Regions:
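Cleavable N-terminal targeting peptides that direct proteins into the secretory/outer-membrane pathway or into
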Residues: 1-31, 76, 90-92
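Short, acidic Ser/Thr/Gly-rich low-complexity loop/linker segments typical of extracellular
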Residues: 55-65
Length: 917
């Protein structure tokens, strides 16, 4: 055999061997493919096809097709469960044999109108179907919100029973406030009544205004301690968990999406304002009478609009004093009794403007998002970029702008190990001024807020009336005083899951939430004023703050089936660690050396600096057991131990827990009501906590002139967190696989209320935080889901939610007291009193019956006597020989009865005016 012949034989043998090895390898792979269709025969895109035991998950294509390729090394002819799940459909599963070669398995999914098979992860130690929950958890998916709002909370409004969502401000970028099942704290100063927020496993410290709602996949809401116990000492207000989008349900390839929204935002309806006044005018109502000493009324008149121009145009850095108009009561002046008969809002302004409408505009709103979702090999991903701009409804204010980037990655490392990354960066600019809108509502009807003088300057004083400190022009303030706040935030989570055995999972995750903001404001030198005759020297303020929070948790889950697979059990052990640090600093001063210089060094006098640091540490340990017998009886229990640096030194560790049970009556063999497709009774009782404010446990002092220390708050080493104990009972009913009804009653007792108490004078401190009360909330919630149209091409259903919560102060260990509720002029409106409804407004009422007067005055009350009933049904003082109709005829208005001669001897009585009890 020649060398060339030998070489050809060797080459042929090697190639044959290679092809045979390759063919053998291919033959060992297992390929599972199929279609997932709806009950209407339509392909379902994004349905999740899973083999749990092998940690394999893949999504369907737009044609509803899925393909799973299992490497030959994992193909052993074993049995496995193939599951398919899609939002809004009843999941299905098939037992398959994982063998070499190809097999086709198709699924037809039925519509799940009430989503009883939907999986939730909040409040439970592992993913659990809604129909097997022993307490209520509300879930809103991206399918429920096809048009995303400007912030995540607005998307929940009206969709969750028991959630009270209020937009207290229409300011661009402002997030609504939310309370779940009523307030949890009588005094929440330095804290919050809002629920704990978790974003992709990260305990949020920076709110939700920075989160792009279009990135959200679903939101789960746990409304009370009966469900939130597993989160311990910071979950008494409930929990909101947000899960952002990922590529877990994607098939091989990349899908791009772009969404652009344009619109305007305005203020509905008209703000009511008086178009007439009480000031004295000439006969043809074109000019206003000026009060001049020694000159009769209307001896001199002026054009009020020309007067407003004069005082603004001829003034330098300030407005000139205007003429004094007859009967100009202004805000604080009391007109004399001589002209009382003219004091009716009956004189018209010659020209009427709408101050609020002048200041408002239909501000533009833009929301644009570009994202990509896909799978490449073992890597799933979701990336997005978003810009949101909202000008707002107030002119001259730039509003709010947010830029957001997100990258979510899921990586399958081996058959039993995977990890995921969730990350988001946000940069926002807030250019809002909070006082402009309030000030414009105080302008009278003759104000022109955008009028300019001969020098092109906006009027600093819009009207010539005596408006006091509120007489400055809000438009001038908005044009020349521009506060600015820049916010940067990064939220990230790294999670890794390992399944060494089919019945054992281990998971570790660490989350980070970092936020920084820089705020600046400046009133420049020469800023015009209305009440000062000297040049405004200016003021400057700069501040910055940075906070970060780190939370980590290690979890072990063990599962086992007993009694020939009739009883499924799950044991979860978890430990967690949290750290939160924040630092702030600022500075500023007055008397700016140079106008236009935006630097704190420009301040010459009253220079100041501020700063603060907070550090919080917390530990947690959890054990949770869940038992499920034949899908009929579900029993669960958990115990959690928490330690937090916010607790008093002698109360560092606290214990929380939960016991729950559900009975799926419709799964009983004897239950033969064909129309009832699902019936579940449930009960759960649990405890959770609300932590004290940062400074509550410490002694605090204020630093005065020369560094002198003054005692402020007395420390308390025995301070405990508030403890929320809630019992929740409910029934879930589905009829004809269509109509869903959920009824829930929750009784929540929040003990150890954190309240400021006045300590003994000998202590030398003005206040001390103590556990000194109890608040009780009772809540009813009803949700009814009614499918109206169900066809192949259109599904339309309506959900009706109703809830009612009553909050009572059931125990108070301090003297009853008033509080203002952070509302101007409400210092004695709200009262904390045992046995009273929390939030009740207190005041005084008018006397309607003679018998309500002191006994010495009852004989003086009646027709023809000193006290008579007026046409409105109130008892008023008339005096002897007068009637309630003699006010103008006898010139009795504004005559007064001294307090010493009046009932109760406290209040002066005005003639004809109702009497306060």
């Amino acid at each position: 055999m020649t060398i060339s012949t030998r070489f050809r034989w060797m080459t042929t043998a090697v190639l044959a061997l290679l092809f045979s090895v390759s063919a053998s390898a291919l033959a060992q792979n297992a390929t599972i493919t199929g279609k997932v269709l709806s009950d209407g025969g339509q392909p379902l895109y994004g349905a999740n096809v899973v083999i749990d035991a092998m940690q394999i998950s893949i999504g369907t294509t737009a044609a509803g097709v899925y393909t799973i390729v299992i490497p030959g090394a994992r193909v052993k002819g074993q049995q496995a469960v193939l599951r398919v799940r899609a939002i809004g459909y009843v999941p299905q599963m098939r037992t398959i044999t994982v063998s070499a070669g190809a097999q086709t398995i198709n699924f037809d999914l039925k519509t799940d109108v009430n989503r009883l098979n939907q999986v939730v992860v909040t409040g439970v130690a592992g993913a659990t179907e809604v129909k097997k929950l022993a307490f209520s958890v509300a879930q809103i998916s991206s399918a429920d919100q096809p048009v995303a709002g400007s912030n995540p909370l607005s998307q929940l409004q009206g969709k969750v029973a028991g959630a009270n969502i209020v937009s207290a401000s229409g300011r661009p970028g402002a997030a609504p406030s939310i309370i779940l099942r009523g307030p949890q704290s009588i005094n929440a100063s330095g804290r919050s009544q809002e629920p704990m927020v978790i974003i992709d496993g990260v305990v949020s410290q920076g709110g939700l205004a920075d989160i792009n709602p279009q990135d959200i996949d679903n939101v789960e809401v746990v409304k009370g301690a009966a469900a939130s116990s597993m989160y311990g000492s910071r979950a008494g207000n409930g929990v909101i968990q947000i899960t952002t989008k990922s590529g877990k349900s994607s098939s091989e390839g990349i899908k791009f999406r772009a969404n652009m929204e344009f619109g305007t935002s305005g203020v509905e309806n008209e703000y009511p304002f008086p178009k007439s006044h009480i000031m004295l005018m000439n006969e043809d109502f074109t000019r206003f009478c000026v009060a001049v000493s020694g000159v009769p009324d209307c001896g001199r008149t002026v054009d009020i609009y020309a007067e407003a121009y004069r005082i603004n145009d001829q003034g330098g850095d300030f407005a000139l004093p205007p003429a004094t108009f007859v009967n100009d009561g202004g805000i604080a002046r009391n007109p004399g009794q001589v002209n009382l008969r003219a004091l009716y809002l009956s004189n018209p302004f010659p020209k009427v403007y709408n101050p609020v409408r002048q200041f408002l505009t239909n501000g533009q709103v833009y929301n644009g998002t570009v994202d990509a979702t896909g799978r490449v090999g073992r890597t799933n991903f979701f990336v997005s970029a978003n810009q949101f701009r909202q000008e707002g409804s107030v002119k001259l204010i730039d509003g709010y702008m947010r830029n957001a980037l997100r990258m979510n990655i899921d990586q399958q490392m081996t058959g039993n190990w995977n990890f995921s990354v969730r990350s988001a960066y946000t940069d926002a600019i807030d250019n809002n001024s909070g006082s402009a809108f309030f000030r414009v509502t105080r302008q009278p009807a003759n104000a022109t807020v955008f009028a300019r003088d001969s020098k092109g300057r906006l009027f600093i004083r819009t009207v010539a009336q005596q408006q006091g400190a509120q007489n400055d022009n809000p438009a001038y303030n908005s044009e020349n005083f521009r506060p600015r706040n820049r916010i940067s935030r990064f939220v990230g989570n790294l999670s890794s899951k390992w399944q060494p055995l089919g019945w054992l999972d281990a998971e570790f995750n660490v989350g980070y939430d970092g936020r920084s903001n820089f705020a600046e404001s400046q009133q420049d030198r020469g800023y015009r004023t209305t009440t000062s005759s000297t040049t405004n020297l200016g003021i400057i303020d700069r501040s910055s703050a940075r906070s970060y929070a780190l939370n980590s948790a290690a979890t072990v889950v063990m599962r086992r089936s007993w009694l020939q697979n009739a009883l499924d059990s799950r044991l979860t052990l978890r430990s967690s660690y949290e750290t939160s640090d924040s630092r702030s600093q600022g500075g500023g001063g007055t008397n700016l050396a140079v106008a236009g210089l935006r630097d704190p060094d420009a301040a010459i006098t009253n220079f100041y600096t501020t700063g603060g640091t907070e550090q919080i540490r917390a530990l947690g340990m959890l054990a949770d057991v869940n038992l499920d017998y034949k899908g009929r009886y579900i029993v669960g229990g958990l115990v959690r131990r928490d330690a937090a640096s916010l607790f008093g030194a002698s109360q560092r560790w606290q214990t929380y827990g939960r016991a729950s049970m559900a009975w799926r009556v419709s799964e009983e063999p004897w239950f033969k009501v064909s129309k009832v497709s699902d019936l579940k009774l449930r009960i759960s009782e649990g405890t959770a906590g609300n932590r004290p404010r940062y400074s509550a446990q410490y002694e605090t002092f204020t630093i005065g002139a020369g560094g002198a220390l003054s005692p402020s708050s007395l420390g308390n080493k025995d301070l405990r967190p508030e403890v929320s104990r809630e019992m929740e009972v409910g029934v879930d009913l589905e009829v004809m696989n269509k109509y869903g009804l959920t009824v829930t009653f929750a009784n929540n007792v929040i003990n150890d209320q954190l309240l400021p108490v006045t300590p003994p004078a000998a202590a030398g401190f003005g206040t001390q935080w103590q556990n000194a009360g109890e608040l009780t909330n009772k809540t009813w919630e009803v949700s009814l889901n009614v499918p109206i149209i169900q066809t192949r091409d259109l599904n339309y259903s309506a959900r009706i939610n109703w809830d009612r919560t009553t909050s009572m102060i059931t125990r108070l260990d301090i003297p009853e007291t008033f509080y203002d509720g952070n509302q101007q002029g409400a210092e004695t409106m709200y009262k904390i009193k045992q046995g009273e409804a929390f939030g009740s407004m207190w005041g005084r009422r008018f006397v309607k019956k003679c018998s309500e007067l002191p006994s010495a005055f009852q004989s003086k009350c009646g027709s023809g006597l000193e006290y008579q009933k007026n046409a409105d049904g109130f008892i008023v003082y008339t005096g002897t020989g007068n009637t309630v109709n003699d006010g103008i005829t006898k010139n009795l208005w504004f005559t007064r009865l001294p307090a010493a001669s009046a009932p109760w001897g406290v209040d002066v009585l005005g003639w004809g005016l109702p009497i306060l009890v």
